[in-house]
């Protein structure tokens, strides 16, 4: 102790020698650092806590605890100790939060490579590379056979392209370790080229790469567990990794309460599509060695396929994996490979000598099941269907007789004998796999004889009124549901007939086009039937197979729903069809129309329905009804193009690039005159004088409105050129004959810095105007039309802008500063909208309807605003007059039409010529305007010739051959097409909704102005000229109606556009009055009529909801919303509560949304006969008789 004390003293004085003032104090109280250092020198142990505790408990004497100053002991550092006991830094909790907050989803990725796994076949991967998104925690795994640079580069290219295309995101940072596979020059250049920052871990700091390391460890734990549980061989290890990744991406995190898929905006995992890893299944062998070989191969389910809607299944007997949907789950506890003796699965050679006739083992209900499951079969079932099968002559005929009363589980001796010689039984087989599962049961529904077919053409589905099931006492159908495959893996016995209660309900699929009557089965019964799915055998048709026994396809509805349906359909302007006499179904090959060898690629880009004229004796559109000179019916693509699944390639057009550039430079149609044309060089003295008068009137109005600062003129050189706006006078003659002049700014060359790009100039939507007019007719409203003179000049301008003075001042070198929003400026429309909106709200007591700009209302008046035009609707004319008085206090307001007469009043509202008799009718047309404008288009009209009775002919196809014209001619023809289609579009969307299909189709060919396209456009203009007197007719709704009824009638023409696109159309009606329509090409490629119909309906729902809100705001009566379609399968899908996964995720999303709309927003969906579907005119060209029949009740 003395030695230690002496050493301590010497050490203390040595340590404090640089600080003489503290020597005396240290002698009284020892510094903790000195004490610790002394222990280090003597004992090489700096533990100050132990030293302090020892002094306190007197295990070390000479010093007391109070003799030492412990204040700086914690912060003391000993270099030798730090060197001797150096460790890695501790993990800082929450250290990655800054990355999560700084980056958007898919911008920061973690990656790591695992491997190699030894003793595997060459075909099996030895490595895998994983990626994890920092924000969403979504994970990806990719197999690798090696760690070469090109292999890693391929994976990086794949993942980056996937994220860019699927999530519209760009990866910014990728964190990885310092392995050579990541630090090589090839990958570094690739990342640098794509603007991605590589973030490497520091040396020997694997914990900094914890996200990727932990993921690999978790996936490997899952892999080992799955392989152990399933008993599958080790070379399937990556399949277990992929299965685990799918599951882990779908499980919610305890911290965020969401799964990685939810964070990424993806739908949740449909558990019904996921099977346990290693689940025993039987896979259909679509390519057997012979017709008598078994069709099933035992296998094990691994994971859902990445590249299809199928499942990856391992087939031990073939030593390979397959991607298929044709499998059946084996229900049993055994899941090991030793369950089957695959060596015993050999076939008796004697069976090859059997020559019995072979009949189809596939019945029509198997095809329906395939459609219902939303799967694609590897086998063409249609080729095995026989409409009139002969009586089977082989030994199996007795076993499948529909009149046999033997229970389904029993078989004849012959069938047993055949089954015993077919295959040697495995050593250990699931008890459910028996002859009753392999061979068809005796009581099977035979393939029905078609008694009636109603084809809807391309606008709907093919409806087969076919009894797919025999009478209840004679049929027992084994079905399988793909959605229930993973719900019950226990043994399940066969069910008996008395356990079921069949009710005919429509079952449909997203991808199919057939709507058939099949039994409704309970959930418990479905689980029992899962394992019994087996093909049916065609047999003789039942005796009573007539239309009288057919149960009609009808979704159950309540009495109130039926009343609602009757109420909705009663007011619609649907055609009256004469009763049809029953007709027999003709021989399918008797009345096939001839095929024209000169068929081209598209029918007017779609004019000429792909399915409308190829269906035999189509009730929807009969060839006998076609009064045109059409002699041929054709498909969308010609016969030679149908040899390939791919659409024909588009042909090149001469001068394509130059033509596109030329289109951009084409000037719009100019209907006005410049100053020199109207005044300076105008040789018409009378017209010149009128324009001069209009010129001075405009100048006086500008000065009156204090449009610019008249006190000071600015030198042009002193002003920033970008703030100088060119100006000009334009002159035109209005429809009423008056001559007008307008001083405008050249906003087309205005600099972007001189206006706020975020401001919007709003005008009333045409649907809002049509809705307001319809409500005015039903409620006996007065309609008052106003005009505000020089409306824009009432709005102040905030920016500093200058213009040249008008020509008559003769001050070309000077500038004047604007104070008002001159016509033509980019911001003028927005400034005026904000000005008048503020005045109507504050001074007139109005409020703007949310979501419908320029529609204002209060308790008495509704106002629709279109720039300087105002339309007022009110039950009390005095309320309109009160608004007018308030407006006149601030604005120069002209009353165009007060609307006080009880007789017919004529209006000219936004181009529509309206005839309105309050409480009776309203007629909307454009006869005067079309009579004036159409002759000016230089179209060879035939005013004295025979009038066209339809806007286009079915079967006329646009030839997409090369366009051999020069640049100047191309510009001229495109300019002409712009004029013609522009006017047609204006008229079509105003009120001629029956022309929208032709207008939309021809508009797609504006940049392809071939002679044929121009001729078809001329024909459309000629039809508009011949029918220019047609009007949209509205009649007042019944006064007893308590509700407003808003209906959308939808239709789709499947695949009648180039590249298999479909044409969709919708017509909107309010209280039986057509207020709008739309015809357009579907944005997605549909694979069936049902998908096309779903797409059409989904396009109508948003506008239907918006219109519903507007109507409720303008009129307080309750509203009923309805959707009408001629596709029963679509209605079945929308009304179904089945949660099965759809074959296509895009249409699945649309269908699920429609279900939500129907169930949550009081939206009624009803069926309408195809012959009464007036939306048919929106999707395809129709024969004259059909076109007239569908349109004569609402436009004539």
Swiss-Prot record:
One of its GO terms (biological process) is DNA integration. Residues 779-917 form the Reverse transcriptase Ty1/copia-type domain. Mg(2+) 3 binds at residues 1051, 1093, 1126. Residues 101-276 form the Integrase catalytic domain. InterPro entries: DNA/RNA_pol_sf, Integrase_cat-core, Retrotran_Ty1/copia-like, RNaseH-like_sf, RNaseH_sf, RVT_2. Keywords: Cytoplasm, DNA integration, DNA recombination, DNA-binding, DNA-directed DNA polymerase, Endonuclease, Hydrolase, Magnesium, Metal-binding, Multifunctional enzyme, Nuclease, Nucleotidyltransferase, Nucleus, RNA-binding, RNA-directed DNA polymerase, Transferase, Transposable element, Transposition. Gene3D superfamilies: Ribonuclease H-like superfamily/Ribonuclease H (3.30.420.10). Mg(2+) 2 binds at residues 787, 868-869. Residues 479-494 have a biased composition (Basic and acidic residues). Its EC number is 2.7.7.49, 2.7.7.7, 3.1.26.4. Residues 397-528, 533-552, 571-628 are annotated as: Disordered. It is found in: Cytoplasm; Nucleus. One of its GO terms (molecular function) is RNA-directed DNA polymerase activity. Residues 446-456, 495-523, 542-552 have a biased composition (Polar residues). The record marks 658-659 as: Cleavage. A motif (Bipartite nuclear localization signal) lies at residues 619-653. It catalyses: DNA(n) + a 2'-deoxyribonucleoside 5'-triphosphate = DNA(n+1) + diphosphate; Endonucleolytic cleavage to 5'-phosphomonoester. GO terms for cellular component: cytoplasm; nucleus. Residues 1051-1193 form the RNase H Ty1/copia-type domain. Its main location: cytoplasm. SUPFAM superfamilies: DNA/RNA polymerases (SSF56672), Ribonuclease H-like (SSF53098). Retrotransposons are mobile genetic entities that are able to replicate via an RNA intermediate and a reverse transcription step. In contrast to retroviruses, retrotransposons are non-infectious, lack an envelope and remain intracellular. Ty1 retrotransposons belong to the copia elements (pseudoviridae). Reverse transcriptase/ribonuclease H (RT) is a multifunctional enzyme that catalyzes the conversion of the retro-elements RNA genome into dsDNA within the VLP. The enzyme displays a DNA polymerase activity that can copy either DNA or RNA templates, and a ribonuclease H (RNase H) activity that cleaves the RNA strand of RNA-DNA heteroduplexes during plus-strand synthesis and hydrolyzes RNA primers. The conversion leads to a linear dsDNA copy of the retrotransposon that includes long terminal repeats (LTRs) at both ends. Integrase (IN) targets the VLP to the nucleus, where a subparticle preintegration complex (PIC) containing at least integrase and the newly synthesized dsDNA copy of the retrotransposon must transit the nuclear membrane. Once in the nucleus, integrase performs the integration of the dsDNA into the host genome. This is Truncated transposon Ty1-A Gag-Pol polyprotein. It comes from Saccharomyces cerevisiae (strain ATCC 204508 / S288c). The gene is TY1B-A.
């Amino acid at each position: 102790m003395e030695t230690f004390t002496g050493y301590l003293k010497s050490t203390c004085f040595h340590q404090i020698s640089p600080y003489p003032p503290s020597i005396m104090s240290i002698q009284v109280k020892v510094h903790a650092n000195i004490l610790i250092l002394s222990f280090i020198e003597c004992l090489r142990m700096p533990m100050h806590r132990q030293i302090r505790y020892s002094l306190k408990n007197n295990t070390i004497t000479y010093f007391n605890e109070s003799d030492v100053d412990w204040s700086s002991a914690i912060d003391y550092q000993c270099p030798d100790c730090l060197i001797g006991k150096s460790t890695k830094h501790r993990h800082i909790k929450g250290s990655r939060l800054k990355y999560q907050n700084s980056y958007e989803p898919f911008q920061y990725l973690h990656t790591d490579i695992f491997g190699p796994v030894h003793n595997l076949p060459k075909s099996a991967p030895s490595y895998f590379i994983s990626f994890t998104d920092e924000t969403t925690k979504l994970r990806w795994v990719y197999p690798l056979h090696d760690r070469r640079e090109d292999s890693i580069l391929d994976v990086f290219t794949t993942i980056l392209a996937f994220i860019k295309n699927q999530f519209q995101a760009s990866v910014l940072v990728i964190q990885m370790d310092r392995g050579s596979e990541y630090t090589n020059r090839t990958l570094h250049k690739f990342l640098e080229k794509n603007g991605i920052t590589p973030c490497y871990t520091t040396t020997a700091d694997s914990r900094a790469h914890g996200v990727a390391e932990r993921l690999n460890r978790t996936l490997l734990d899952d892999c080992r567990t799955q392989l152990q549980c399933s008993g599958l061989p080790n070379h399937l290890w990556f399949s277990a990794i992929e299965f685990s990744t799918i599951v882990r991406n779908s499980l919610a995190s305890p911290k965020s309460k969401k799964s990685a898929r939810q964070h990424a905006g993806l739908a949740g995992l449909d558990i019904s599509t996921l099977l346990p890893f290693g689940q025993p299944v039987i896979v259909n062998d679509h390519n057997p060695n012979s017709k008598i070989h078994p069709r099933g191969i035992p296998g094990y389910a691994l994971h859902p396929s990445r590249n299809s809607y199928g499942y990856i299944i391992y087939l031990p007997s073939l030593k390979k994996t397959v991607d298929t949907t044709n499998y059946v789950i084996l229900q049993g506890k055994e899941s090991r490979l030793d369950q089957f003796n695959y060596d015993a699965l050999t076939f008796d050679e004697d069976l090859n000598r059997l020559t019995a006739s072979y009949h189809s083992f596939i019945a029509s209900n198997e095809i329906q099941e395939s459609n219902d499951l939303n799967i694609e079969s590897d086998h063409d079932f249609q080729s095995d269907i026989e409409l009139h099968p002969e009586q089977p002559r082989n030994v199996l005929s007795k076993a499948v007789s529909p009149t046999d009363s033997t229970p389904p589980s029993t078989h004849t001796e012959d069938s047993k004998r055949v089954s015993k010689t077919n295959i040697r039984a495995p050593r250990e087989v699931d008890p459910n796999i028996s002859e009753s599962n392999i061979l068809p049961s005796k009581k099977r529904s035979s393939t029905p004889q078609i008694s009636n077919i109603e084809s809807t053409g391309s606008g709907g589905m093919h409806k087969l009124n076919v009894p797919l099931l025999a009478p209840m006492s004679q049929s027992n159908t084994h079905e399988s549901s793909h959605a229930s495959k993973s719900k019950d893996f226990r043994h399940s016995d066969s069910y008996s007939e008395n356990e079921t209660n069949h009710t005919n309900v429509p079952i449909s699929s997203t991808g199919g086009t057939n709507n058939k009557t099949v039994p409704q089965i309970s959930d418990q019964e479905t689980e029992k039937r899962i394992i019994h799915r087996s093909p049916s055998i065609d047999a003789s048709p039942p005796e009573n197979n007539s239309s009288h026994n057919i149960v009609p396809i009808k979704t159950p509805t309540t009495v109130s729903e039926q009343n609602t349906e009757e109420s909705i359909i009663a007011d619609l302007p649907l055609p009256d069809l004469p009763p049809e006499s029953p007709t027999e179904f003709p021989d399918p090959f008797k009345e096939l129309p001839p095929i024209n060898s000169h068929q081209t690629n598209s029918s007017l880009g779609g004019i000429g329905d792909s399915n409308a004229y190829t269906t035999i004796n189509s009730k929807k559109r009969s060839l006998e009804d076609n009064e045109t000179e059409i002699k041929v019916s054709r498909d969308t693509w010609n016969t030679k193009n149908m040899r390939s699944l791919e659409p024909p390639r588009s042909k090149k057009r001469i001068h394509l690039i130059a033509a596109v550039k030329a289109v951009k430079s084409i000037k719009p149609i100019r209907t006005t005159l410049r100053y020199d044309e109207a005044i300076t060089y105008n040789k018409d003295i009378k017209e010149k004088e009128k324009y001069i008068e209009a010129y001075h009137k405009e100048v006086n109005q500008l000065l009156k409105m204090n449009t610019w600062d008249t006190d000071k003129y600015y030198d042009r050189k002193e002003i920033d050129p970008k703030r100088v706006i060119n100006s000009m006078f334009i002159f035109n003659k209005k429809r009423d004959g008056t001559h007008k002049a307008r001083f405008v700014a050249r906003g087309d060359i205005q600099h972007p810095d001189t206006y706020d790009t975020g401001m919007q100039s709003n005008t009333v939507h045409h649907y809002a105007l049509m809705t307001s007019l319809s409500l005015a007719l039903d409620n006996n409203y007065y309609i008052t039309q106003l005009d505000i003179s020089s409306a824009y000049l009432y709005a102040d301008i905030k920016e500093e802008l200058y213009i040249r003075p008008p020509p008559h001042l003769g001050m070309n070198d000077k500038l004047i500063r604007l104070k008002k929003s001159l016509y033509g400026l980019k911001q003028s429309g927005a400034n005026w909208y904000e000005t008048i909106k503020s005045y109507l709200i504050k001074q007139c007591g109005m409020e703007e309807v949310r979501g419908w700009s320029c529609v204002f209302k209060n308790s008495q008046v509704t106002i629709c605003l279109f720039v300087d035009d105002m339309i007022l609707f009110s039950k009390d004319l005095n309320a309109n007059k009160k608004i007018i008085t308030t407006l006149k206090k601030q604005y120069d307001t002209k009353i165009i039409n007060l609307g006080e007469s009880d007789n017919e009043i004529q209006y000219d509202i936004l181009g529509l010529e309206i005839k309105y008799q309050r409480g009776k009718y309203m007629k909307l047309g454009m006869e005067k305007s079309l009579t004036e404008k159409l002759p000016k288009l230089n179209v060879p009209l035939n005013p004295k010739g025979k009038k066209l009775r339809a806007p286009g002919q079915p079967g006329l196809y646009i030839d997409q051959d090369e366009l051999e014209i020069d640049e100047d001619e191309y510009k001229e023809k495109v300019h002409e097409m712009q004029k013609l289609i522009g006017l047609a579009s204006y008229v079509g969307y105003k009120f001629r909704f029956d022309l929208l299909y032709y207008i939309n189709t021809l508009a797609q060919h504006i940049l392809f102005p071939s002679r044929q396209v121009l001729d078809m456009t001329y024909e459309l203009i000629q039809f508009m000229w011949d029918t220019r007197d047609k009007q949209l007719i509205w009649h007042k709704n019944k006064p007893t109606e308590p509700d407003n009824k808003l209906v959308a009638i939808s239709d789709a023409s499947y695949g009648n556009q180039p590249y298999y696109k479909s044409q969709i159309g919708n017509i909107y009606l309010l209280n039986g009055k057509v207020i709008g329509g739309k015809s357009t090409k579907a944005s997605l490629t549909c694979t069936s009529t049902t998908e096309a119909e779903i797409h059409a309906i989904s396009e109508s729902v948003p506008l239907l909801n918006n219109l519903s809100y507007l109507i409720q705001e303008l009129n307080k009566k309750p509203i009923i919303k309805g959707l009408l379609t001629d596709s029963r399968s679509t209605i079945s899908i929308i009304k179904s509560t089945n949660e099965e996964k759809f074959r296509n995720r895009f249409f699945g999303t649309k269908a699920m949304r429609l279900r939500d709309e129907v169930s949550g927003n009081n939206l009624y969906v009803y069926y309408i006969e195809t012959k009464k579907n007036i939306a048919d005119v929106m999707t395809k060209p129709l024969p004259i008789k059909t076109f007239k029949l569908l349109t004569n009740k609402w436009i004539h």
